[in-house]
Amino acid sequence: MSDEKTQLIEAFYNFDGDYDGFVSVEEFRGIIRDGLPMTEAEITEFFEAADPNNTGFIDYKAFAAMLYSVDES
């Protein structure tokens, strides 16, 4: 497994506080507020883009896709 993939998996599980395989908007918001200078609007925009079905949760695949899309822009 590549170092990049390992880091991405570790990041996902840092967000997934209850280790259920999904990151809720509350888990996401809590971690972001502790570490990154994002506004509430930016947090909402990021999460909505990662959760197009509006379930309130994102899985690892959606999490990775969003991080890669942010990195490429």
Curated annotation (Swiss-Prot):
GO terms for molecular function: calcium ion binding; myosin I binding. Changing D16A: Unable to bind Ca(2+). It comes from Dictyostelium discoideum. This is Myosin-IB light chain. Myosin I is a dimer of a heavy and a light chain. Inability to self-assemble into filaments. Interacts with myoB. Does not interact with myoC or myoD. Ca(2+) binds at D16, D18, D20, E27. The keyword Metal-binding applies. GO terms for cellular component: myosin I complex. Disulfide bonds: none annotated. Functions as the light chain for myosin-B. Binds calcium with submicromolar affinity and may sense physiological calcium changes. Residues 3-38, 38-73 form the EF-hand domain. InterPro entries: EF-hand-dom_pair, EF_hand_dom. The keyword Transcription does not apply. Keywords: Calcium, Metal-binding, Motor protein, Myosin, Repeat. It comes from the Eukaryota.
